[in-house]
Amino acid sequence: MLSKIMLVEDDFALAMATEYALQSEGYQVVCADNLQKARGILDESVDLVLLDLMLPDGNGYSFCKEIRDGGFEMPVIFLTAVSDEANIVQGLELGADDYVTKP
């Protein structure tokens, strides 16, 4: 069972709502609102990464690639408002396990 989820999301309200929902289900959630913070959090203890695509200091594609190039095998799920097929395919090709569009 997953226990530690890293949420990389720069929309404060969405991050807080997602964090609350996950914590109420018993998950430990660590949040980052940019890639610099996410890089500082990422380690083997993270069981799942929920990753926004558009962030203030880069994009989720590059971080997903960094995760995979670094040998990390935890699932990565894009959680983003960008829903066109080309972006979904690109995310999956870079190693994401799933791609969920947010409202």
Regions from the language model: what does each represent?
Residues 1-103:
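N-terminal/domain-start alpha-helical segments
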